[in-house]
Amino acid sequence: MSNQTVSELKVLTAKSATNYGFDVTDFKMFTHLNPLSIQVNIRHKNPDKKVTIDDCSILSQYIDEAIQGSSILDQPFNLEISSEGIGDFLTEEKDFQTFKGFPVEVSYQDLKKIEQQINGLLLKRTDNELHINQKGKTQRIPVEDVIQVRLATPSG
């Protein structure tokens, strides 16, 4: 991927964030991942306001639409919008819906009640199972065995 493409994506992302009252504090691209991963950290332009999960979700939709509507990127990508002020742990049903497709780290107990950890992309949480995409394969973890789920930084 060319430096020009990365620069154009940074500018487009910053403009989209500014239009909705946010500043981009960090922009990273993980081009070695398939699909490509774009990680954007934001903050409110108004320093008295905190960034919420809903803010991240809404801004993610706007930035995704802007990227899709441009001719800058012609390949699949994952977009992650976050803020330093948001907790890393997913606990509420709304969190699991909002961060579908995001990289997560899951701690759980296996059949022998030994704590294990896996990383992957969050697919969904049902009443009975947590579904994680790990290298293209769906891992299903019983909800009662899950210790914690937290947002993770994409890695290769």
Swiss-Prot record:
It holds the Pfam family RimP_N. GO terms for biological process: ribosomal small subunit assembly; translation. GO terms for cellular component: cytosol. The keyword Cytoplasm applies. It is found in: Cytoplasm. SUPFAM superfamilies: YhbC-like, C-terminal domain (SSF74942), YhbC-like, N-terminal domain (SSF75420). Keywords: Cytoplasm, Ribosome biogenesis. The keyword Cytoplasm applies. Required for maturation of 30S ribosomal subunits. Belongs to the RimP family. This is Ribosome maturation factor RimP.
